[in-house]
Structures are given as structure tokens and as C-alpha cells.
């Protein structure tokens, strides 16, 4: 399968990319910075999740899209609530729209265990809102999806 991983230069994305590559999938990584861990055979596209043209280039031709691009630091999200909305919600909606346009078979979203708690501040709010959008895209537009709720990931 052809797989695109947004946020693929990060801790989680880079490990998922490597595992998928080992299993024979064609992996395209899309991130705001070039991956330090890019493996042989993986394609790298550098761009911002909010740049629709670059995001579309990353998604076009993919069978599956893993959405790992996020403002994932809880403290940073508290200091930058607008960025948490732009990246975690708007970035996800832009990705969903392009997945529909290019007939992506499955959308996999990295969320957080905080969505059902009172912890996590704006990070929690943005991840919960993104999950709500994903569920509505499934109901209204039929996109197949998986939501993964991770705990804290230490590097």
C-alpha cells in the first residue's frame, strides 16, 4: 500500500514509518522539517500542514493517511491556543478534505487519552474537537477512519 504520514519526522511518526516500510509499504513522510531518521525507500516532503498545495502533494496517490502532525506539547498548547486550533483542528480538517478528494481508503488519527478527562488543557480540547470532526466526516461523507488514543510518549 501507499501510505502518507503527516508529522512523520516526529518520534511516533518516524517509528511507524519504519515499521510500515519494513512490511513492504511505500511510505511518504510529510512534515515541517526534514526527518533525521529517513530510511531507504521512504519519500520526504517538507511543508506545513496548513499549506493546502503541499499537503495535497503529500496525500495524492495514498491509500492510507496517518495524521500525526500536531502541536502535541501540552504546555506549548496552553501558551499558543490559536496554534493548537490551527494545527490540531484546521490541519486535520484540511487533511480529511484532501483524503476525500483523492479517495484515500483509510484515515488514521493520533489522538490522546486526555480527550475524556479534565487534564490536558487546550491540547485536550483541540484533539477532542478533531475527533468530533472525524466522526462527522465518517457519518456525513463516509470516510473510513481509526482513532488511536495514546498516553504520554517519552523520547
Regions found by a protein language model. Give the residues of each.
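N-terminal Rossmann NAD(P)H-binding glycine-rich loop of SDR-like oxidoreductase domains
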Residues: 3-23
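SDR active-site strand-loop-helix element
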Residues: 6, 30, 65-69, 107-113, ...
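Conserved active-site helix of classical SDR/Rossmann-fold NAD(P)-dependent CH-OH oxidoreductases
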Residues: 18, 92-93, 128-135
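Conserved glycine-rich Rossmann-like NAD(P)H-binding loop of the short-chain dehydrogenase/reductase
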Residues: 25-34
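Rossmann-fold cofactor-recognition segment
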Residues: 41-51
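NAD(P)H-binding glycine-rich loop region in Rossmannoid oxidoreductase-like domains
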Residues: 49-86, 98, 114-117
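Conserved Rossmann-fold NAD(P)-dependent oxidoreductase catalytic core, especially the SDR/UDP-sugar
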Residues: 86, 90-128, 145-146
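Conserved beta-loop-beta element that borders a ligand/cofactor-binding pocket
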Residues: 112, 132-155
Amino acid at each position: 500500500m501507499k501510505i502518507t504520514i503527516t508529522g512523520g519526522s516526529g518520534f511516533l511518526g518516524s517509528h511507524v514509518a519504519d515499521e510500515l516500510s519494513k512490511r513492504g509499504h511505500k511510505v511518504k513522510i510529510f512534515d515541517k522539517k526534514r526527518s533525521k531518521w529517513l530510511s531507504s525507500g521512504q519519500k520526504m516532503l517538507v511543508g506545513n500542514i496548513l499549506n493546502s498545495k503541499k499537503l495535497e502533494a503529500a496525500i495524492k496517490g495514498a491509500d492510507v493517511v496517518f495524521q500525526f502532525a500536531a502541536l502535541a506539547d501540552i504546555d506549548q498548547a496552553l501558551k499558543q491556543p490559536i496554534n493548537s486550533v490551527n494545527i490540531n483542528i484546521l490541519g486535520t480538517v484540511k487533511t480529511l478534505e484532501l483524503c476525500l478528494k483523492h479517495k484515500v481508503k483509510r484515515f488514521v488519527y493520533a489522538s490522546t487519552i486526555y480527550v475524556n478527562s479534565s487534564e490536558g488543557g487546550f491540547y485536550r480540547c483541540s484533539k477532542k474537537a478533531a475527533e468530533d470532526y472525524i466522526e462527522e466526516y465518517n457519518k456525513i461523507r463516509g470516510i473510513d477512519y481509526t482513532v488511536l488514543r495514546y498516553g504520554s510518549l517519552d523520547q
